[in-house]
Amino acid sequence: MKRFTAFVALVLLAAATAVSCSKDKDAGKLAFDRPAVFLQPGGTATVGFSSTDIKSYSISSKPVGWDDAIVLDEGAMSVRITAPTVFEDDARADEGTEEEEKAERSGTLTLAGTSFGGKRVTATLFVSVSKTVDMSDRPANSYLVNGRECNYTFDAMHKGDGQSALATASVDIVWQSKTNLIQYLSLDDGKVSFYVGADEDEDDRIDEGNALIGAYDADGTLIWSWHVWAADYDPDPDADGGSVVVFNGYTMMNRNLGALANGNETTDEILASYGLYYQWGRKDPFIGPSTYRADNGSSASMYNAKSGTVKLESVESDAETGTADYAVQHPLEYITGTADSDYDWAWSHDGALWGESKTVNDPCPYGWRVAPSEAFEGLTISGTPAAADYDKFGWTLTDGTSQSFFVGAGRRRYDNGTILNIYNPVPAEAQSRNTATEAQPWEGLYWTSDAGSGAQSPAFYFWFEKKTSGGSVEYDVPYARANGMQVRCVRGK
Protein backbone atom coordinates (compact mmCIF):
# COMPACT_ATOMS: atom_id res chain seq x y z
CA MET A 1 0.00 0.00 0.00
CA LYS A 2 2.84 2.34 0.88
CA ARG A 3 4.51 1.63 -2.47
CA PHE A 4 1.24 2.32 -4.31
CA THR A 5 0.75 5.59 -2.39
CA ALA A 6 4.30 6.63 -3.17
CA PHE A 7 3.77 5.79 -6.86
CA VAL A 8 0.57 7.87 -7.00
CA ALA A 9 2.34 10.78 -5.29
CA LEU A 10 5.18 10.55 -7.80
CA VAL A 11 2.76 10.55 -10.73
CA LEU A 12 0.90 13.55 -9.32
CA LEU A 13 4.18 15.42 -8.76
CA ALA A 14 5.31 14.70 -12.31
CA ALA A 15 1.95 15.85 -13.65
CA ALA A 16 2.10 19.04 -11.61
CA THR A 17 5.62 19.71 -12.83
CA ALA A 18 4.55 19.13 -16.43
CA VAL A 19 1.62 21.51 -16.03
CA SER A 20 3.90 24.13 -14.46
CA CYS A 21 6.42 23.84 -17.29
CA SER A 22 3.61 23.93 -19.83
CA LYS A 23 2.22 27.10 -18.29
CA ASP A 24 5.66 28.74 -18.32
CA LYS A 25 6.13 27.76 -21.95
CA ASP A 26 2.64 28.89 -22.91
CA ALA A 27 3.22 32.31 -21.32
CA GLY A 28 6.37 33.17 -23.27
CA LYS A 29 8.86 35.91 -22.45
CA LEU A 30 9.52 39.30 -23.99
CA ALA A 31 12.02 42.03 -23.06
CA PHE A 32 13.72 45.07 -24.59
CA ASP A 33 17.51 45.19 -24.63
CA ARG A 34 17.50 48.45 -22.69
CA PRO A 35 14.99 50.27 -20.43
CA ALA A 36 14.89 53.61 -22.25
CA VAL A 37 15.95 55.57 -25.31
CA PHE A 38 16.68 59.30 -25.37
CA LEU A 39 16.54 61.29 -28.59
CA GLN A 40 16.81 64.78 -29.99
CA PRO A 41 13.88 66.15 -32.09
CA GLY A 42 13.83 64.18 -35.34
CA GLY A 43 16.52 61.80 -34.09
CA THR A 44 16.40 58.06 -34.74
CA ALA A 45 17.36 55.00 -32.71
CA THR A 46 16.94 51.25 -33.10
CA VAL A 47 16.33 49.14 -30.00
CA GLY A 48 16.47 45.37 -30.04
CA PHE A 49 14.34 42.96 -28.06
CA SER A 50 14.51 39.29 -27.11
CA SER A 51 11.77 36.72 -26.75
CA THR A 52 11.06 33.12 -25.88
CA ASP A 53 8.13 31.12 -27.29
CA ILE A 54 6.51 34.14 -29.00
CA LYS A 55 4.89 33.69 -32.41
CA SER A 56 3.74 37.24 -33.22
CA TYR A 57 4.40 40.83 -32.17
CA SER A 58 2.66 44.20 -32.28
CA ILE A 59 3.03 47.72 -30.90
CA SER A 60 0.08 48.01 -28.53
CA SER A 61 0.64 51.54 -27.24
CA LYS A 62 2.87 54.53 -27.80
CA PRO A 63 3.07 58.17 -26.67
CA VAL A 64 0.67 60.68 -28.21
CA GLY A 65 1.99 62.00 -31.51
CA TRP A 66 4.46 59.15 -32.08
CA ASP A 67 2.12 57.16 -34.34
CA ASP A 68 4.28 57.28 -37.47
CA ALA A 69 7.55 57.35 -35.58
CA ILE A 70 7.78 53.70 -34.56
CA VAL A 71 8.48 50.82 -36.93
CA LEU A 72 8.48 47.20 -35.77
CA ASP A 73 10.85 44.79 -37.56
CA GLU A 74 9.93 41.26 -36.42
CA GLY A 75 12.64 39.63 -38.51
CA ALA A 76 15.41 41.73 -36.99
CA MET A 77 13.66 41.67 -33.61
CA SER A 78 14.01 45.41 -33.25
CA VAL A 79 11.99 48.60 -33.09
CA ARG A 80 13.06 51.69 -35.02
CA ILE A 81 12.06 54.94 -33.33
CA THR A 82 12.07 58.40 -34.87
CA ALA A 83 11.39 61.29 -32.53
CA PRO A 84 8.73 63.89 -33.44
CA THR A 85 9.77 67.49 -34.04
CA VAL A 86 6.75 69.43 -32.73
CA PHE A 87 5.52 69.01 -29.17
CA GLU A 88 2.54 70.01 -27.10
CA ASP A 89 4.71 72.10 -24.76
CA ASP A 90 6.67 73.72 -27.61
CA ALA A 91 5.95 77.33 -28.55
CA ARG A 92 6.06 76.30 -32.20
CA ALA A 93 3.14 73.97 -31.63
CA ASP A 94 0.81 76.95 -31.44
CA GLU A 95 1.88 78.38 -34.77
CA GLY A 96 -0.54 76.74 -37.19
CA THR A 97 0.05 73.16 -36.09
CA GLU A 98 -3.01 70.97 -35.84
CA GLU A 99 -3.77 69.79 -32.31
CA GLU A 100 -3.56 66.13 -33.26
CA GLU A 101 -0.05 66.64 -34.66
CA LYS A 102 1.38 67.83 -31.35
CA ALA A 103 3.40 65.16 -29.59
CA GLU A 104 4.28 64.30 -26.02
CA ARG A 105 7.98 64.65 -25.26
CA SER A 106 8.11 61.45 -23.25
CA GLY A 107 6.07 58.34 -22.74
CA THR A 108 5.96 54.57 -22.77
CA LEU A 109 6.10 52.33 -25.82
CA THR A 110 4.53 48.91 -25.25
CA LEU A 111 5.50 45.90 -27.34
CA ALA A 112 3.00 43.04 -27.15
CA GLY A 113 3.64 39.43 -28.00
CA THR A 114 1.41 36.38 -28.37
CA SER A 115 2.88 33.07 -27.25
CA PHE A 116 2.38 29.75 -28.99
CA GLY A 117 0.04 28.88 -26.16
CA GLY A 118 -2.12 31.93 -26.92
CA LYS A 119 -0.96 34.00 -23.95
CA ARG A 120 -0.28 37.74 -24.26
CA VAL A 121 2.91 39.21 -22.81
CA THR A 122 4.28 42.75 -22.98
CA ALA A 123 7.54 44.68 -22.70
CA THR A 124 7.82 48.43 -22.13
CA LEU A 125 10.35 51.01 -23.29
CA PHE A 126 10.55 54.60 -22.07
CA VAL A 127 11.04 56.96 -25.04
CA SER A 128 11.90 60.59 -24.53
CA VAL A 129 12.97 63.66 -26.44
CA SER A 130 15.23 65.12 -23.79
CA LYS A 131 18.67 66.53 -23.26
CA THR A 132 21.53 64.11 -22.72
CA VAL A 133 24.35 65.38 -20.51
CA ASP A 134 27.55 63.37 -20.92
CA MET A 135 29.80 63.82 -17.87
CA SER A 136 32.48 61.38 -19.01
CA ASP A 137 35.02 64.19 -19.38
CA ARG A 138 34.50 65.15 -15.72
CA PRO A 139 35.47 61.99 -13.82
CA ALA A 140 34.83 62.04 -10.07
CA ASN A 141 33.32 59.98 -7.28
CA SER A 142 30.26 62.23 -7.18
CA TYR A 143 28.22 63.90 -9.90
CA LEU A 144 26.09 66.97 -9.25
CA VAL A 145 23.12 66.98 -11.64
CA ASN A 146 20.72 69.92 -11.74
CA GLY A 147 18.70 69.71 -14.98
CA ARG A 148 15.19 68.27 -14.79
CA GLU A 149 13.97 65.59 -17.19
CA CYS A 150 17.46 64.89 -18.46
CA ASN A 151 19.42 61.80 -19.38
CA TYR A 152 22.85 61.71 -17.74
CA THR A 153 25.83 59.55 -18.62
CA PHE A 154 29.34 59.06 -17.23
CA ASP A 155 32.28 56.71 -17.65
CA ALA A 156 31.65 53.35 -15.97
CA MET A 157 34.97 51.77 -16.88
CA HIS A 158 37.25 53.87 -14.67
CA LYS A 159 37.36 54.90 -11.04
CA GLY A 160 36.69 58.45 -9.94
CA ASP A 161 40.19 59.54 -10.90
CA GLY A 162 39.42 58.77 -14.54
CA GLN A 163 42.60 56.67 -14.79
CA SER A 164 42.23 53.41 -12.86
CA ALA A 165 40.43 50.83 -14.99
CA LEU A 166 37.33 48.92 -13.88
CA ALA A 167 35.98 45.63 -15.26
CA THR A 168 32.38 46.82 -15.05
CA ALA A 169 29.85 44.26 -16.32
CA SER A 170 26.66 45.77 -14.87
CA VAL A 171 25.39 48.67 -12.78
CA ASP A 172 22.69 48.96 -10.15
CA ILE A 173 21.38 51.34 -7.50
CA VAL A 174 23.04 50.71 -4.14
CA TRP A 175 20.71 53.18 -2.42
CA GLN A 176 18.65 56.24 -3.20
CA SER A 177 17.00 58.72 -0.85
CA LYS A 178 13.58 58.40 -2.49
CA THR A 179 11.93 55.85 -4.74
CA ASN A 180 12.38 56.38 -8.47
CA LEU A 181 14.90 59.18 -8.08
CA ILE A 182 17.24 57.38 -10.49
CA GLN A 183 15.23 56.06 -13.43
CA TYR A 184 16.04 53.84 -16.42
CA LEU A 185 19.52 53.00 -15.19
CA SER A 186 21.61 51.03 -17.66
CA LEU A 187 25.15 50.32 -18.82
CA ASP A 188 25.50 51.47 -22.43
CA ASP A 189 28.79 51.24 -24.32
CA GLY A 190 30.84 51.52 -21.16
CA LYS A 191 28.84 54.39 -19.73
CA VAL A 192 26.36 54.62 -16.88
CA SER A 193 23.09 56.04 -18.22
CA PHE A 194 20.19 57.27 -16.09
CA TYR A 195 17.31 59.73 -16.10
CA VAL A 196 16.18 62.21 -13.45
CA GLY A 197 12.69 63.69 -13.74
CA ALA A 198 11.00 66.82 -12.43
CA ASP A 199 9.80 67.59 -8.93
CA GLU A 200 6.19 66.49 -8.41
CA ASP A 201 5.14 69.80 -6.86
CA GLU A 202 7.36 72.17 -8.85
CA ASP A 203 7.74 70.75 -12.34
CA ASP A 204 10.26 73.42 -13.36
CA ARG A 205 12.77 72.00 -10.85
CA ILE A 206 14.73 68.77 -10.81
CA ASP A 207 13.54 65.93 -8.60
CA GLU A 208 16.02 66.36 -5.74
CA GLY A 209 17.79 63.72 -3.69
CA ASN A 210 20.91 61.58 -3.38
CA ALA A 211 21.81 58.15 -4.68
CA LEU A 212 24.72 55.74 -4.95
CA ILE A 213 25.19 53.83 -8.20
CA GLY A 214 27.35 50.71 -8.06
CA ALA A 215 29.55 49.05 -10.67
CA TYR A 216 29.66 45.24 -10.56
CA ASP A 217 32.04 42.80 -12.25
CA ALA A 218 31.02 39.64 -14.10
CA ASP A 219 30.79 37.73 -10.81
CA GLY A 220 28.40 40.28 -9.33
CA THR A 221 30.97 41.77 -6.96
CA LEU A 222 30.65 45.48 -6.24
CA ILE A 223 33.91 47.05 -7.45
CA TRP A 224 33.19 50.81 -7.34
CA SER A 225 30.36 53.26 -6.80
CA TRP A 226 29.48 56.86 -7.59
CA HIS A 227 27.37 59.35 -5.66
CA VAL A 228 24.69 61.19 -7.66
CA TRP A 229 23.68 64.49 -6.07
CA ALA A 230 20.47 65.73 -7.72
CA ALA A 231 19.86 69.31 -6.60
CA ASP A 232 18.56 72.63 -7.88
CA TYR A 233 22.02 74.07 -7.32
CA ASP A 234 24.87 75.19 -9.56
CA PRO A 235 28.19 76.10 -7.94
CA ASP A 236 29.92 76.94 -11.21
CA PRO A 237 29.20 80.71 -11.24
CA ASP A 238 31.98 82.67 -9.58
CA ALA A 239 29.74 85.12 -7.73
CA ASP A 240 30.87 85.27 -4.11
CA GLY A 241 27.83 85.17 -1.84
CA GLY A 242 25.73 83.39 -4.47
CA SER A 243 26.23 79.68 -4.97
CA VAL A 244 29.79 79.88 -3.67
CA VAL A 245 31.65 81.78 -0.97
CA VAL A 246 35.34 82.71 -0.74
CA PHE A 247 37.14 82.13 2.57
CA ASN A 248 40.90 82.56 2.96
CA GLY A 249 41.37 82.46 -0.79
CA TYR A 250 39.41 79.21 -1.20
CA THR A 251 36.28 79.18 -3.35
CA MET A 252 33.86 77.02 -1.38
CA MET A 253 30.41 75.64 -2.14
CA ASN A 254 27.88 77.46 0.04
CA ARG A 255 26.20 74.22 1.06
CA ASN A 256 27.31 70.84 2.35
CA LEU A 257 28.08 67.99 -0.01
CA GLY A 258 24.75 66.26 -0.70
CA ALA A 259 22.60 69.05 0.81
CA LEU A 260 19.41 70.22 -0.90
CA ALA A 261 19.34 73.64 0.79
CA ASN A 262 21.41 75.89 3.02
CA GLY A 263 19.40 77.77 5.61
CA ASN A 264 17.46 77.54 8.85
CA GLU A 265 14.29 79.57 8.36
CA THR A 266 12.09 76.48 8.76
CA THR A 267 12.55 72.99 10.15
CA ASP A 268 12.18 71.58 6.63
CA GLU A 269 14.99 73.84 5.43
CA ILE A 270 17.19 72.79 8.33
CA LEU A 271 16.70 69.12 7.46
CA ALA A 272 17.34 69.78 3.75
CA SER A 273 20.56 71.59 4.69
CA TYR A 274 22.01 68.45 6.22
CA GLY A 275 24.43 67.00 3.73
CA LEU A 276 25.76 63.46 3.79
CA TYR A 277 28.19 62.05 6.33
CA TYR A 278 31.67 60.77 5.49
CA GLN A 279 34.25 58.84 7.46
CA TRP A 280 37.62 60.49 6.98
CA GLY A 281 39.28 59.13 3.84
CA ARG A 282 36.27 57.19 2.52
CA LYS A 283 34.71 58.26 -0.76
CA ASP A 284 31.20 56.92 -0.23
CA PRO A 285 28.59 58.85 1.75
CA PHE A 286 26.20 57.84 4.50
CA ILE A 287 22.70 59.28 4.44
CA GLY A 288 21.56 62.01 6.84
CA PRO A 289 18.96 61.92 9.63
CA SER A 290 15.23 61.34 9.47
CA THR A 291 14.46 64.50 11.46
CA TYR A 292 16.11 67.90 11.72
CA ARG A 293 16.82 67.49 15.45
CA ALA A 294 18.87 64.37 14.74
CA ASP A 295 19.20 63.51 18.42
CA ASN A 296 17.81 59.97 18.28
CA GLY A 297 20.34 58.42 15.93
CA SER A 298 17.78 57.50 13.25
CA SER A 299 18.83 57.60 9.59
CA ALA A 300 16.58 58.74 6.77
CA SER A 301 15.04 56.01 4.62
CA MET A 302 16.94 54.51 1.70
CA TYR A 303 15.61 52.49 -1.23
CA ASN A 304 16.92 50.18 -3.94
CA ALA A 305 15.97 50.10 -7.62
CA LYS A 306 12.82 48.08 -6.87
CA SER A 307 11.66 50.54 -4.17
CA GLY A 308 12.57 48.13 -1.41
CA THR A 309 14.13 49.52 1.74
CA VAL A 310 17.88 49.44 2.24
CA LYS A 311 19.52 49.44 5.67
CA LEU A 312 22.86 50.74 6.88
CA GLU A 313 24.88 48.25 8.91
CA SER A 314 27.92 48.63 11.12
CA VAL A 315 30.98 46.42 11.38
CA GLU A 316 34.00 46.74 13.66
CA SER A 317 37.34 47.57 12.14
CA ASP A 318 39.87 44.76 12.00
CA ALA A 319 42.60 43.59 9.64
CA GLU A 320 39.97 42.44 7.11
CA THR A 321 37.26 45.10 7.35
CA GLY A 322 39.50 48.08 8.03
CA THR A 323 40.91 48.40 4.52
CA ALA A 324 40.23 50.74 1.62
CA ASP A 325 39.31 47.79 -0.62
CA TYR A 326 36.76 46.49 1.89
CA ALA A 327 35.29 49.99 2.24
CA VAL A 328 34.84 50.28 -1.53
CA GLN A 329 33.04 46.93 -1.74
CA HIS A 330 30.81 47.65 1.28
CA PRO A 331 29.47 51.22 1.00
CA LEU A 332 26.47 50.32 3.17
CA GLU A 333 28.70 49.29 6.07
CA TYR A 334 29.80 51.87 8.60
CA ILE A 335 33.20 50.66 9.80
CA THR A 336 33.38 51.50 13.49
CA GLY A 337 36.56 52.25 15.37
CA THR A 338 37.75 50.16 18.30
CA ALA A 339 40.46 50.54 20.90
CA ASP A 340 42.60 48.15 18.85
CA SER A 341 42.25 50.39 15.76
CA ASP A 342 42.77 53.58 17.81
CA TYR A 343 39.20 54.47 16.81
CA ASP A 344 40.14 54.78 13.16
CA TRP A 345 37.98 52.87 10.67
CA ALA A 346 41.19 51.96 8.83
CA TRP A 347 43.10 49.24 10.65
CA SER A 348 46.41 50.48 9.24
CA HIS A 349 46.14 54.26 9.49
CA ASP A 350 46.48 55.98 6.12
CA GLY A 351 46.79 59.75 6.03
CA ALA A 352 47.00 59.81 2.22
CA LEU A 353 43.38 58.78 1.53
CA TRP A 354 42.48 62.49 1.34
CA GLY A 355 44.93 65.33 0.98
CA GLU A 356 45.99 68.70 -0.40
CA SER A 357 45.48 67.38 -3.93
CA LYS A 358 42.35 65.54 -5.07
CA THR A 359 42.80 61.82 -4.49
CA VAL A 360 41.07 58.76 -5.94
CA ASN A 361 39.01 58.66 -2.73
CA ASP A 362 37.99 62.32 -2.69
CA PRO A 363 34.16 62.52 -2.50
CA CYS A 364 33.66 65.92 -4.16
CA PRO A 365 32.54 66.51 -7.78
CA TYR A 366 34.98 67.15 -10.62
CA GLY A 367 37.04 70.29 -10.07
CA TRP A 368 36.32 70.30 -6.34
CA ARG A 369 37.96 68.66 -3.33
CA VAL A 370 37.46 68.35 0.42
CA ALA A 371 38.21 71.69 2.09
CA PRO A 372 41.44 71.94 4.12
CA SER A 373 41.39 73.34 7.65
CA GLU A 374 43.03 76.51 6.34
CA ALA A 375 39.82 77.36 4.49
CA PHE A 376 37.97 77.65 7.82
CA GLU A 377 40.66 79.50 9.75
CA GLY A 378 39.52 82.72 11.39
CA LEU A 379 35.79 82.25 10.81
CA THR A 380 33.59 83.75 13.50
CA ILE A 381 29.88 83.86 14.27
CA SER A 382 28.10 86.65 12.40
CA GLY A 383 26.13 88.77 14.86
CA THR A 384 25.68 88.19 18.56
CA PRO A 385 24.59 84.72 19.74
CA ALA A 386 21.29 84.76 21.62
CA ALA A 387 18.88 82.41 23.36
CA ALA A 388 16.75 82.24 20.20
CA ASP A 389 19.61 80.43 18.46
CA TYR A 390 18.69 77.33 20.46
CA ASP A 391 16.42 76.21 17.59
CA LYS A 392 18.52 77.56 14.71
CA PHE A 393 20.76 74.50 14.32
CA GLY A 394 23.71 76.34 12.89
CA TRP A 395 25.59 79.60 12.61
CA THR A 396 26.13 82.08 9.84
CA LEU A 397 29.91 82.34 9.85
CA THR A 398 32.04 85.12 8.41
CA ASP A 399 35.64 86.08 7.80
CA GLY A 400 34.67 89.74 8.00
CA THR A 401 33.98 90.04 4.28
CA SER A 402 32.10 86.95 3.11
CA GLN A 403 29.64 84.79 5.00
CA SER A 404 27.83 81.47 4.73
CA PHE A 405 25.39 79.48 6.84
CA PHE A 406 26.75 76.24 8.29
CA VAL A 407 24.21 73.75 9.62
CA GLY A 408 24.93 72.13 12.97
CA ALA A 409 24.56 68.56 11.77
CA GLY A 410 26.47 66.75 14.51
CA ARG A 411 28.24 63.56 13.50
CA ARG A 412 27.91 59.81 13.10
CA ARG A 413 29.52 58.21 16.13
CA TYR A 414 32.84 56.44 15.72
CA ASP A 415 31.72 53.49 17.86
CA ASN A 416 28.31 52.59 16.38
CA GLY A 417 27.60 54.83 13.37
CA THR A 418 24.43 56.40 14.77
CA ILE A 419 23.81 60.13 14.36
CA LEU A 420 24.58 62.22 17.44
CA ASN A 421 23.80 65.93 17.57
CA ILE A 422 24.10 66.83 21.24
CA TYR A 423 27.00 68.82 22.59
CA ASN A 424 27.79 68.17 26.25
CA PRO A 425 30.27 70.71 27.60
CA VAL A 426 30.55 69.27 31.11
CA PRO A 427 33.16 66.50 31.66
CA ALA A 428 31.45 63.15 32.15
CA GLU A 429 32.82 62.64 35.65
CA ALA A 430 31.33 65.97 36.81
CA GLN A 431 27.85 65.45 35.44
CA SER A 432 24.86 64.96 37.65
CA ARG A 433 22.30 62.25 36.96
CA ASN A 434 20.19 64.71 35.04
CA THR A 435 22.66 65.12 32.20
CA ALA A 436 19.84 66.09 29.83
CA THR A 437 19.72 69.49 31.52
CA GLU A 438 23.34 70.03 30.56
CA ALA A 439 23.14 68.70 27.01
CA GLN A 440 23.27 71.38 24.36
CA PRO A 441 20.94 71.16 21.33
CA TRP A 442 23.41 71.03 18.44
CA GLU A 443 26.97 71.17 17.20
CA GLY A 444 28.65 71.32 13.82
CA LEU A 445 31.46 69.00 12.74
CA TYR A 446 33.06 69.09 9.29
CA TRP A 447 35.95 66.99 8.13
CA THR A 448 38.93 68.72 6.57
CA SER A 449 41.31 67.14 4.07
CA ASP A 450 44.24 67.53 6.47
CA ALA A 451 45.81 64.20 7.41
CA GLY A 452 46.63 65.07 10.99
CA SER A 453 48.60 62.37 12.75
CA GLY A 454 48.10 58.78 13.81
CA ALA A 455 44.41 57.84 13.85
CA GLN A 456 43.08 61.40 14.07
CA SER A 457 42.48 64.19 11.57
CA PRO A 458 41.49 67.84 12.10
CA ALA A 459 37.80 68.78 11.98
CA PHE A 460 36.15 72.17 11.70
CA TYR A 461 34.03 72.47 14.85
CA PHE A 462 31.41 74.86 16.26
CA TRP A 463 28.62 74.66 18.82
CA PHE A 464 25.82 76.42 20.70
CA GLU A 465 25.76 76.50 24.49
CA LYS A 466 22.36 77.26 25.98
CA LYS A 467 23.57 78.11 29.49
CA THR A 468 25.34 81.20 28.20
CA SER A 469 23.30 81.59 24.97
CA GLY A 470 26.65 81.61 23.24
CA GLY A 471 28.85 79.53 21.04
CA SER A 472 32.29 79.21 19.58
CA VAL A 473 34.21 78.08 16.50
CA GLU A 474 37.44 76.07 16.15
CA TYR A 475 38.92 75.24 12.77
CA ASP A 476 41.24 72.27 13.45
CA VAL A 477 40.16 70.03 16.32
CA PRO A 478 41.56 66.45 16.14
CA TYR A 479 38.90 63.72 15.93
CA ALA A 480 39.05 59.96 15.44
CA ARG A 481 38.70 59.14 11.74
CA ALA A 482 35.90 56.62 12.34
CA ASN A 483 33.56 59.55 13.04
CA GLY A 484 31.23 60.46 10.20
CA MET A 485 31.04 64.18 9.46
CA GLN A 486 29.74 66.69 6.95
CA VAL A 487 31.97 67.95 4.13
CA ARG A 488 32.34 71.26 2.31
CA CYS A 489 34.02 71.23 -1.10
CA VAL A 490 36.47 73.86 -2.39
CA ARG A 491 37.70 74.39 -5.92
CA GLY A 492 40.89 72.52 -6.63
CA LYS A 493 44.08 74.56 -6.51
Listing of model-derived features with the role each one plays in the protein:
Residues 259, 336-493:
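C-terminal, surface-exposed recognition/capping segments
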Residues 114-123, 219-225:
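Short, exposed coil/turn segments at beta-strand boundaries within extracellular/luminal domains
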Residues 189-191, 209-211, 238-383, 474, ...:
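Short aromatic-cysteine micro-motif
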Residues 134-165, 215, 220-274:
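GGW-centered surface loops in extracellular recognition modules
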Residues 89-116, 207-218:
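A short beta-strand micro-motif common to beta-rich folds, especially ectodomain repeats
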Residues 10-38, 120-132:
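Bacterial Sec-dependent N-terminal signal peptides
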Residues 1-8:
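Bacterial N-terminal signal peptides that target proteins for export
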Residues 28-32, 52-92, 131-201:
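Surface-exposed binding patches on compact interaction domains or structured appendages
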